[in-house]
Every structure is written in C-alpha cells, then in structure tokens.
C-alpha cells in the first residue's frame, strides 16, 4: 500500500491510496479532481472509487466532476450526510476492498457533521494501518462542532479512534498543525512532546513540507482533545468530567486568537 498527499485549495489535503499488487487506487476527498487524476497518472494507478469523509464543499465538492472524468467510478459517503455525488452510502462497520491487498473499514465519527465517516485502511494481514479522519481529528486538534455535541466528539475521538492500534498513521483533511500545537501549549504549557512536535512542525512548514501523517500514539500524547480524560487538564480547566473538558477545550479553541 502506498499513500500520496495531493494538496488542494488553500490548506486541504486529498489523498491517493494505491494497492501495489494491482495498481488500483482510491482517492479521499478529491475536491480538485484534475490534480488527483494527475497524481494517479504519475504513479501509474487506476482510480476505482472515492472515499468522502463528509459533505462540506471543500471535501465533497469535486465528486460530480470526478464522476464525469473517470467512467464507472464509485463515490462512497456517510449515509447520514448529504454527500454530493454519492453513489454508495456507507455506515459504521461497513467494509470495502481496494485491489487485492487493502481492507477499508468505515467508522462513523460524528460531530463536525452528523454523518462524518473516517476510513481505517490496512493490508490483508493488518499491516501499515492508516486512518483518514477528514475534519473530525486533525493533528493536535479536531473539527468544529457544527452538527454535533461534545458527547459525540468525545465518542468519536476518545472511544472510536482511540481504540485503533497506536502505530496507525493519521491523515487528516487540513494543514492546521502549527496553529493547533500552539493552542495545545496553552492547555499544557509543560508538555515536552507538544513543544518538540511544534518545533518540528514549524520546520516542516518553512520547508513547504506536510506535517501529516501523525500517528495515533502521537495524538494521544499531544492532542488536547484526545487528552480530556487527564485529571491535570480537567483540574486546570475547572471541569469535572471528560465531556465537560471536551466542551471547554473546544470553547477555548474557538475563542483563541493565537
């Protein structure tokens, strides 16, 4: 399995997932279809289907166009989201196969949108796990609670995604990492892992390189939204429960002007 970034718009990422045995490919959130198709051609891959994380235009806005450009392509999207151009709806636990060797598991991760899907991808033997989290989980952050609650985001981040293997690579929908880590330091100023990752992320961006992927293990160490069960964070924010802490961290992030 190979995964390639396709930078789009101002700070979006689409992704190309290639099964090396067959050259078959899936694309995640191809908002700029021409760019994604060019990447597939460069890597001599054949696009078979689209994995849409959620209905927002900067993720699903290229679906109709890619259907025109790639005959017989399938477009997957969450059954509870009104995904533009969707041909096949998926629900939590649905399984797909790409080529000969890649398994894909749909995970319902609502809150940013009510039907948001994250896609957990690995090889036939479970090797090289990766998860495409759209705007639910960012590196050191999470999406705004546009269509859901703190309870839902807690379930999505701290139960559903946190249960994946720790080496799982995290591929999210936007390059927000530096700002997210700067905010994370306001929550945990003495967290050395956050300090180290922020220094690295700044270097990456100065070199015009992506900060993605992260890993689930790194997120559990540095992402304040995945650390809301930590007593020291709850105490600092004056909260009594992980869900209250999730709500408070989101409120602080929404008001933060770093």
Swiss-Prot record:
UniProt keyword list: Cytoplasm, Hydrolase, Iron, Metal-binding, Zinc
GO-annotated cellular components: cytosol; secretory vesicle
Positions of transmembrane segments: none
Enzyme Commission no: 3.1.2.6
GO terms of molecular function: hydroxyacylglutathione hydrolase activity; metal ion binding
Expressing tissues: Mainly expressed in flowers and flower buds. Also detected in roots and leaves.
Catalytic activity: an S-(2-hydroxyacyl)glutathione + H2O = a 2-hydroxy carboxylate + glutathione + H(+)
Cofactor(s) essential for the protein: Fe(2+); Zn(2+); Fe(3+)
Cited SMART domains: Lactamase_B
Subcellular localization, as worded in the UniProt entry: Cytoplasm
Binding site for Fe cation: 58-59, 135, 174
CDD domains assigned: hydroxyacylglutathione_hydrolase_MBL-fold (cd07723)
Co-factor binding details: Binds 1 Fe(2+) or Fe(3+) and 1 Zn(2+) ion per subunit, catalysis is optimal with 1 Fe and 1 Zn. Electron spin resonance indicates the presence of a mixture of protein molecules that contain either Fe(2+) or Fe(3+) and Zn(2+). Mn(2+) is not a cofactor.
Pathway participation: Secondary metabolite metabolism; methylglyoxal degradation; (R)-lactate from methylglyoxal: step 2/2
Annotated Gene3D superfamilies: Ribonuclease Z/Hydroxyacylglutathione hydrolase-like
Pfam families: HAGH_C, Lactamase_B
Effect of residue 227 to A: Decreases metal binding and enzyme stability
Biological role: Thiolesterase that catalyzes the hydrolysis of S-D-lactoyl-glutathione to form glutathione and D-lactic acid.
Family the entry assigns: Belongs to the metallo-beta-lactamase superfamily. Glyoxalase II family.
Self-association state and partner proteins as the record states: Homodimer.
Name of protein: Hydroxyacylglutathione hydrolase cytoplasmic
Organism the protein comes from: Arabidopsis thaliana
Gene transcribed to yield this protein: GLX2-2
């Amino acid at each position: 399995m190979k995964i390639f970034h396709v930078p789009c718009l101002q700070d979006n990422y689409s992704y190309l997932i290639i099964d090396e045995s067959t050259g078959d490919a899936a694309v995640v959130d191809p908002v700029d279809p021409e760019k994604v198709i060019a990447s597939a051609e460069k890597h001599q891959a054949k696009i078979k289907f689209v994995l849409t994380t959620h209905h927002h235009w900067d993720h699903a806005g290229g679906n109709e166009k890619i259907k025109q450009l790639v005959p017989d392509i399938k477009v997957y999207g969450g059954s509870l989201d009104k995904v533009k151009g969707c041909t096949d709806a998926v629900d939590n636990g649905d399984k797909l196969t790409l080529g000969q060797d890649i398994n894909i598991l749909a995970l319902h991760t609502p809150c940013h949108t009510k039907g948001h899907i994250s896609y957990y991808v690995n090889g036939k033997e479970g090797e090289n796990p990766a998860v495409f989290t759209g705007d639910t989980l960012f590196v050191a952050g999470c999406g705004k609670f546009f269509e859901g609650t703190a309870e839902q985001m807690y379930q999505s981040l701290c139960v559903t995604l946190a249960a994946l293997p720790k080496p799982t690579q995290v591929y999210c929908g936007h390059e927000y990492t530096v700002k997210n880590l700067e905010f994370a330091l306001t929550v945990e100023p003495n967290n050395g892992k956050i300090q180290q990752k922020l220094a690295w992320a700044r270097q990456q961006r100065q070199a015009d390189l992506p900060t993605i992927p992260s890993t689930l293990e790194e997120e559990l160490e540095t992402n304040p939204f995945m650390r809301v069960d930590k007593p020291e964070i709850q105490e600092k924010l004056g909260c009594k429960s992980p869900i209250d802490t999730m709500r408070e961290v989101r409120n602080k992030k929404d008001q933060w002007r770093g």
